[in-house]
UniProtKB/Swiss-Prot annotation:
It catalyses: isopentenyl diphosphate + 2 oxidized [2Fe-2S]-[ferredoxin] + H2O = (2E)-4-hydroxy-3-methylbut-2-enyl diphosphate + 2 reduced [2Fe-2S]-[ferredoxin] + 2 H(+); dimethylallyl diphosphate + 2 oxidized [2Fe-2S]-[ferredoxin] + H2O = (2E)-4-hydroxy-3-methylbut-2-enyl diphosphate + 2 reduced [2Fe-2S]-[ferredoxin] + 2 H(+). InterPro entries: LytB/IspH. It comes from Desulfotalea psychrophila (strain LSv54 / DSM 12343). Binds 1 [4Fe-4S] cluster per subunit. Keywords: 4Fe-4S, Iron, Iron-sulfur, Isoprene biosynthesis, Metal-binding, Oxidoreductase. Pathway: Isoprenoid biosynthesis; dimethylallyl diphosphate biosynthesis; dimethylallyl diphosphate from (2E)-4-hydroxy-3-methylbutenyl diphosphate: step 1/1; Isoprenoid biosynthesis; isopentenyl diphosphate biosynthesis via DXP pathway; isopentenyl diphosphate from 1-deoxy-D-xylulose 5-phosphate: step 6/6. Its EC number is 1.17.7.4. The active site is at E134. It is an enzyme of class 1 (oxidoreductase). This is 4-hydroxy-3-methylbut-2-enyl diphosphate reductase. GO terms for biological process: dimethylallyl diphosphate biosynthetic process; isopentenyl diphosphate biosynthetic process, methylerythritol 4-phosphate pathway; terpenoid biosynthetic process.
Length: 313
């Protein structure tokens, strides 16, 4: 790719992209806790799945831990945006921790749905990724029959005690197509299956739709986001499903010159936990290597804002 090329080179920026309302709330919650209570503030697991965000908050005085026992009694403990199980909540209280729940409100709504189905005597199926913190937190909201199914193949093998009372929910950051493949099997095997129209959060759906639009008018898609970010991985998959090459990158340092040979139109998006500064870094990298025109795509406007969480009494 040469800056002397006469080809018309374009950068097209997906809209919406980057931070969603739930991520913004979680980050604001940590910053507010630091401001109101001082350092250190402890966070159970990564508040969101992006190392740049984590590093920034760590520099501000946040301490990230994997076990509640790592937190001193009486200290502030923030639960991540992905949510936690009832057992974690009870354990934190038993350890004398002061807790703040930064669970995304949309994830909390799935928790309430699971609790409702469980109270009605249903076996609950969670369509989602095994060992993902959101799925583990959702599964842990109740005791009893809860099953996690990640694929259509797993759905074919699922065995439940009562097929006449069965309901499903989904991880909020999945791709719609992945969920539908599993549901086709579940509905065939369990005709009385209950469930919502969709648990995919609006931000996840909006960003996936934006990538589909981007894929139709670009030669290559760059998805800015961490490798452990579920929604970022889904964005890359949505791009490749259209036949457009798509790469998941942590930041501009992951870019390779070879990707852009013969490429005139580059699409850029970012996962829901990736800050806009990382997108800007990618754009700067490209501008140093070609005479690009930058176009901001039009897409679904998001005006939702969630208030930061405070101490649980």
């Amino acid at each position: 790719m040469s800056s002397e090329s006469d080809k018309k080179l374009e950068i097209r920026l997906a809209s919406p992209r980057g931070f969603c309302a739930g991520v913004e709330r979680a980050i604001e919650t940590v910053k507010l806790a630091l401001k109101e209570h001082g350092e250190p503030v402890y966070v159970l697991h990564e508040i969101v799945h992006n190392r740049h965000v984590i590093d920034n908050l760590r520099q501000g005085g946040a301490v990230f831990v994997e076990e509640l026992e790592q937190i001193p009694a009486g200290a502030i403990c923030i639960f991540s945006a992905h949510g936690v199980s009832l057992q974690i909540e009870k354990r934190a209280k038993a350890l004398g921790l002061k807790t703040i729940d930064a669970t995304c409100p949309l994830v909390s709504s799935v928790h309430r749905m699971v609790e409702k189905y469980h109270a009605e005597g249903c076996s609950v199926v969670i369509i989602g990724h095994h060992r993902h913190p959101e799925v583990e937190g959702t599964a842990g909201r109740v005791t009893g029959e809860v099953y996690v199914v990640a694929t259509a193949a797993e759905a074919e093998k699922l065995q439940v005690n009562n097929s006449e009372k069965i309901a499903f929910v989904t991880q909020t950051t999945l791709a719609e197509n992945d969920i539908e493949q599993v549901l086709v099997v579940l509905r065939r095997r369990f005709p009385l299956l209950q469930g919502p129209k969709s648990n995919i959060c609006f931000a996840t759906q909006n960003r996936q739709n934006a990538v589909r639009t981007l894929a139709r008018c670009t030669d290559l898609i760059l998805v800015v986001g961490s490798k452990n970010s579920s929604n970022s991985n889904r964005l890359r998959e949505v791009g490749t499903e259209t036949g457009t090459p798509a790469y998941l990158i942590d930041d501009f340092k992951d870019l390779k010159e070879s990707w852009f040979r013969g490429c005139e139109r580059v699409g850029i998006t970012a996962g829901a936990s990736a800050p806009e500064s990382l997108v800007e870094g990618v754009v700067v990298w490209l501008l140093k290597r070609g005479r690009y025109e930058i176009t901001e795509m039009t897409g679904q406007q998001e005006k939702v804002h969630f208030k930061a969480a405070s101490l649980i009494d």
